[in-house]
Amino acid sequence: MYLKGENIGFGYNENNLILEDVDISLGSGDVLGLVGDSGCGKSTLCRILAGYEKNYKGKVSLDGSKISSSGYNPVQLIFQHPEKAVNPKWKMKDILKEGHDVSQDILEAFGIKENWLNRWPNELSGGELQRFALARALGPKTKFLIADEITTMVDAITQAQIWENILGIVEELDIGVLVVSHDKSLINRLCHDVLYMSDLNGC
């Protein structure tokens, strides 16, 4: 299975294009890195691939077909700031159940403690919230995971643990991963191949 973006263009006006004629392809089981400076359109491209942006040029497809806007999205996007992806009025146990029932194995893999489940989002740290976001995203119907600077808020040891768990789970489930980061050393450790926004988008 392939997630493809073809001739992707995006901008708030014709004289200020953030993306122009960008092509990207990610296969099942691939771990692909995406590197670029701030302002080069990395996050915008992620949002387009995951269906968050609608007013773009070009085509996004899953094995040649348009991704349905209803039901569970097989392309899951994890944001740099997880607090933006949770409902502050829900307890964490309810947030986890939003898309599917998360297995105990995945909860344990990400070190999610049982007493965290009855807390509100504002009672957890950014790193703890990110663990919930990852557990929720790695559902049985997920085919691709887009990770946009997801471990910038944690220390190096925690970063290594989180990525070790992600890579183990996605390998088992044959999920393709797009790892977006400005940290080239992290990208080189994790990824099978690397794309540079300077090559894709000329910036």
Where are these regions (language model features)?
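Q-loop/switch helix immediately C-terminal to the Walker
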Residues: 81, 88-102
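The feature captures the beta-strand-to-loop junction immediately N-terminal to the Walker
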Residues: 35-37
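Conserved ABC ATPase signature
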Residues: 120-124, 128
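Conserved ABC transporter NBD signature motif
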Residues: 57-71
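A short, flexible loop at the N-terminus of ABC-type nucleotide-binding domains that lies
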Residues: 1-5, 9-21, 28
